[in-house]
Swiss-Prot record:
InterPro entries: Arg_biosynth_ArgJ, ArgJ-like_dom_sf, ArgJ_beta_C
SUBUNIT field: Heterotetramer of two alpha and two beta chains.
Active site: T195
Name the record gives this protein: Arginine biosynthesis bifunctional protein ArgJ
Record keywords: Acyltransferase, Amino-acid biosynthesis, Arginine biosynthesis, Autocatalytic cleavage, Cytoplasm, Multifunctional enzyme, Transferase
Entries under Pfam families matching the protein: ArgJ
Family label: Belongs to the ArgJ family.
Cystine pairs: none
Encoding gene per record: argJ
Site residues (Involved in the stabilization of negative charge on the oxyanion by the formation of the oxyanion hole), renumbered to this chain: T121, G122
Transmembrane segments: none
Phylogenetic lineage: Bacteria, Bacillati, Bacillota, Bacilli, Bacillales
Site (Cleavage): A194, T195
Length: 408
């Protein structure tokens, strides 16, 4: 998609409250010791919304409630999120608790119940401590200040080491339109959606069905192309809210600036996806895999994700070992039809394989480049014109330690 980069500007100090109409808050209520664990995003008016959910067949209670809310009118005005407890596999009581969270939020913020989404993340199979939740929700006072947006980003974290935020400005109908996002995710990342939550705000004027189409397509190229450990979760989703307060004409696929909006949405999702991959549990390196010259985009993405999801590739990268044999082995495991004689592989811009034949390279130079925190693997199939990318991280000793002691 060709879009003038000049029409998109990254706002380094922007946040989810930068788009017109949004406020946020994050606070500590006692679900996690000494850390923020409850947050909310609120819109001044009912906002068009869209969502993409985990494909795990076991879906947590908050996800079911959010689906119910969005299906009613395709609008949201508030999102309430807790961390420290997933409210997953908690039976009928868990579903009742999630609906109560929605009702409490609606009453507190003065909005319709079906305008409230709820999300939870944390330990599975533990009942939600509703007495703490009830007392906590009534203390939420969202604000339009950037520091409150940052407090929300902290409140949704679990094993994450860093908050994940991004914001862009674009020109639609000659007017400034902003779009921002926040996410959490560190372990159990292998979406079609998995163990990650992301919330996107924009003041673009766009209807529910159009926004849903754009979000679904972009999620497939961004969030669904990250993997940390190959496990999918029960709770996770991406929700986008559009206040419409930029006062442009309605944006749809026929709008002259449609591609600009889609590009900005993709940049937000891609930024957050990379931040999640980079913050994988125990991770020390971000791995980006680009597959070029494939017959279809889907095949390119499948190969890229196969490579970045390989435990052997991950451990080689962690050990700063240029073992490209693990990369080509992963390509062969992808179940995509390839020509085994025409494959090129570059690692950190150094050619290690050409037409499927090993190439001489400086081990010393390679070792130095593999010490960097961002690792790039490029694969050229020479079969077609399509490309695809995926993101992940290395696999370290610390990952095992974190997950062996998660409940303790």
């Amino acid at each position: 998609m060709m879009v003038k980069v000049a029409s998109i500007t990254k706002l380094e100090d922007g946040s989810i409250v930068t788009p017109k109409g949004f406020s946020a808050i994050g606070t500590a209520i006692g679900l996690k010791k000494g850390k923020k664990d409850l947050g909310a995003i609120v819109c001044d008016t009912p906002a068009s919304c869209a969502a993409v959910y985990t494909t795990n067949q076991i879906q947590a209670a908050p996800l079911q409630v959010t689906k119910d809310s969005i299906a009613t009118e395709g609008k949201l005005q508030a999102i309430i999120v807790n961390s420290g407890n997933a409210n997953a596999c908690t039976g009928m009581k868990g579903l009742q608790d999630a609906y109560e969270m929605r009702a409490l939020g609606a009453e507190h913020f003065g909005v319709k119940e079906n305008y409230v989404a709820v999300a939870s993340t944390g330990v599975i199979g533990v009942p939600l401590p509703m007495e703490i939740i009830r007392k906590g929700i009534v203390t939420l006072i969202p604000a339009k200040e950037e520091n409150e947006a940052h407090s929300f980003s902290e409140a949704i974290l679990t094993t994450d080491l860093i908050t994940k935020e991004t914001c862009y400005e674009m020109i639609i109908d000659g007017k400034k339109v902003t779009i921002a996002g926040v996410a959490k995710g560190s372990g159990m990342i292998h979406p079609n959606m998995a163990t990650m939550l992301s919330f996107i705000t924009t003041d673009a004027h766009i209807e529910h069905d159009v926004l849903q189409t754009a979000l679904s397509q972009i999620t497939n190229h961004t969030f669904n192309q990250i993997t940390v450990d190959g496990d999918t979760s029960t709770n996770d989703m991406v929700i986008a809210m559009a206040s419409g307060l930029s006062e442009t004409k309605p944006i749809d696929m026929e709008h002259a600036d449609w591609e600009t909006f889609v590009f900005a949405l993709q940049k937000v999702c891609e930024d957050l996806a990379k931040k999640i991959a980079q913050d994988g549990e125990g991770a020390t390196k971000l791995i980006e895999v680009n597959v070029l010259g494939a017959q279809t985009n889907e095949e390119a993405k499948k190969i890229a994700k196969q490579i970045v999801g390989s435990s052997l590739v991950k451990t080689a990268i962690h050990g700063e070992d240029p073992n490209w044999g693990r990369i080509i082995s992963s390509i062969g495991q992808s179940e995509v039809a390839i020509n085994p004689n025409t494959i090129d592989i570059t690692l950190q811009s150094i050619v290690v394989l050409k037409n499927s034949e090993p190439q001489m390279f400086s081990e010393e130079e390679m070792k130095m480049r593999l010490q960097e925190h961002e690792i790039m693997i490029d694969v050229y199939l020479h079969l077609g014109e399509e490309t695809g990318s995926a993101w992940g991280c290395d696999l370290s000793y610390e990952y095992v330690k974190i997950n062996a002691c998660y409940r303790t």
